Amino acid sequence: MTVHDGNGWTRCGRGHRHWGRHGAAGLLVAAPDQDGEPRVLLQQRSWWGSHGGAWGPPGGARDSHETELHTALREAEEECALDPDAVTVHGVWRDDHGGWTYRTVLANAPAPLAAFPVSEETREVAWVPVDDVSSLRLHPGFAEQWSALRGVLMPLTVIVDAANVVGSRPDGWWRDRAGAAGRLMDQLAVLASGGITSLPEAVPVPVLERWFPQFVVVLEGAAAAARDPADPGRAPAPSRLRIVRATGSGDDEIARLAACVPGQRLVVTADRELRARCETTGASVIGPRWLLDLL
């Protein structure tokens, strides 16, 4: 085991004994198999360790200088040889025990990735069908949280009706529609890189400590000439912000995206007709004020 300053036992406010002086984190990666069925990457702990033989996401103690994202990705690489650059993080689940916290970092991959045991702490690694997870002997902490975690395995996509959002701010946008759209995208690039801590109540998902959704901004008309967003200096932003320049009706493009994008979808618009079209696809809809308050 590599020596880290987080290694060691501690007790939480409930009196339970936990590994990780500064808390701990694990990585729960989901990916579709060749038939499109979801699977998650789990490791079986070595028999000699705590909860030996139990299954759960790869994870371990957080070092004092690390974020939970760094810890989870590092542990998955150290224990399962998982390439951290091959997954996309979309959220963080927090399990607070009072003075000690375990965070599950949620991520996705386009397909099951190569993974195998590379540490003495790991007995076996497998991409397990989601429907089969509960039949395994699970780590008690993971077993307690699994039913909720299963509801947030898929990423969240926020589809932004740029014309509607820009038009809700009386800042002279009508004088330069492309410039106004560009300013909105710059703000969204910063927001996308840092994530968001809450969602509207209309979105039917369990509460996460932080979401890292993909933002899809739909531009139309003169605004479609807007420049690409400025780099906010944070690596995750480019992959979390997608620009769609509609060649026809922006509303039609938004409705199409709401119908075909996998996972949870949240459409930002105040247009009543568009709202109704998106809701028929199963997407949630919220007005521009929610998004503007985050910028």
Question: What is the meaning of each model-derived region?
Answer:
Residues 28, 46, 131, 163, ...:
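Anionic group-transfer/hydrolysis microenvironments
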Residues 155-160, 167-295:
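Nuclease catalytic cores that cleave nucleic-acid phosphodiester bonds
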Residues 61-154:
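Unchanged
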Residues 1-28, 32-34:
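Acidic, metal-coordinating catalytic segment for phosphate/diphosphate chemistry
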Residues 49-53:
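A conserved beta-turn-beta hairpin within the catalytic core of GNAT-like acetyltransferases
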Residues 24-29, 156-162:
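Short, hydrophobic/glycine-enriched beta-strand segments
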Residues 38-40:
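Entry beta-strands of beta-propeller and related beta-repeat scaffolds
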Residues 55-66, 173:
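Short histidine-centered catalytic/ligand-binding loop motif
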